[in-house]
């Protein structure tokens, strides 16, 4: 298999109740360290408050778990790794996932020889399978309802900017990471007609994207910002999705500005989905789809706001169709200029900026995620706008001015006279300071000409 390495385009955020994050992270680390220690796919965050889920009635329709994680492992002579993994899944805190109903009948779409395990009813189910040839695989599978399968393929091709590998008529996958002996995949599986999907509310898929302005109007459900670099939406079956905008200071790639050799996002989206039908089924059934839910943003005091289900952390957005309307294209285009100005300021300190972009943070509270040894611990937090009680639908230009004044004070301190012992480097430091001030003045002039924009 061809090697596909580098930063992961997808991570899976698992939301645990308060006080249970460390245990969940350690449990996953112990399970995965012997399989793929070089890949950190799962990030654990703790909720601000316990969650109570509302059960939905589906009028005698079977529901299948929306997400699973399957480990395809070798069993070489003299090695007991496969049995050690199975043994871990059969002990606390893991629980065997029931594949039979209350009458003892096998649930649809489960095979008699398959066993699944789970840590919580709202977390993915896990399974282990033995393979005799090829590389070992960790596969995250999203189960799609029969009518949504083709649309889901187009959606994830558009987000990942790569074509899916079609293995069967009802199964496809994306290779996210590959080495000579291991592969990480995201797969889509079509369910039989009449079977609905049970989305896992405590599981959130996060994807890294280069540009958000052109992507938002093409999404099937409302997409709203929850921080300066993260936007939230959901797929056709209700799986929560986070889109993290990548601003790479090392390559000079800003939001809306592409580096050499990179195609515009619009052309890439067209080329990837050109083989699919021009009119998605979702547009024909738009009225039948449920509205998207939004991550609950805690109040400044720390207490979460209430919503339609007591204690639940997802709620329906008040302005569901404003974000994805055609008129929003111009406003989203303006937002890319402001993000571009913010990216220019981050060039002043590349190391700090890079750490902020790479840091994984709590998608529910905005605090640092729970990490356990021996993996590296990240101390970056969510941008502070996640701590506000309302989503940042409106971002006035004056807010950028506040940041500008703060940066001016920092630059003035850098240009202050040096002590006598450091006068030998005065010429060099003056040159650097003048360059920084020149960049800052350009940012101020651009901001004065722009009006406030709305997302």
From Swiss-Prot:
Record InterPro entries: FAM124, FAM124_dom
Coiled-coil ranges from the UniProt annotation: none
Compositionally biased region (Polar residues): 313-322
The keyword Phosphoprotein is assigned to this record: yes
Subcellular locations according to the entry: Nucleus
Keywords, in A-Z order: Nucleus, Phosphoprotein
Family named by the database record: Belongs to the FAM124 family.
Subunit structure: Interacts with CHD7 and CHD8.
Protein known as: Protein FAM124B
Taxonomic classification: Eukaryota, Metazoa, Chordata, Craniata, Vertebrata
Gene: FAM124B
